[in-house]
Amino acid sequence: GGGGRYPGGGGGGRGGGRYSGGGGRGGGGGRGGRGGGGRKCCS
């Protein structure tokens, strides 16, 4: 996990994939970002 980006409002945090729109959840065993309605992008 780690190395992921979370653009958008309430973004941030660490994750395996990239998420846009309110941060969303993390992946790859990393920690998810804060915020709801997150979309998985450019995984």
Curated annotation (Swiss-Prot):
GO terms for cellular component: extracellular region. Its main location: secreted. Residues 1-43 are annotated as: Disordered. It comes from the Eukaryota. Keywords: Cell wall, Cell wall biogenesis/degradation, Repeat, Secreted. One of its GO terms (biological process) is cell wall organization. It is found in: Secreted, Cell wall. Induction: In response to mechanical wounding of plant tissue and probably also after pathogen infection. Responsible for plasticity of the cell wall (Potential). Might play a role in wound healing and plant disease resistance. This is Glycine-rich cell wall structural protein. It comes from Solanum lycopersicum. The lineage of its organism: Eukaryota, Viridiplantae, Streptophyta, Embryophyta, Tracheophyta.
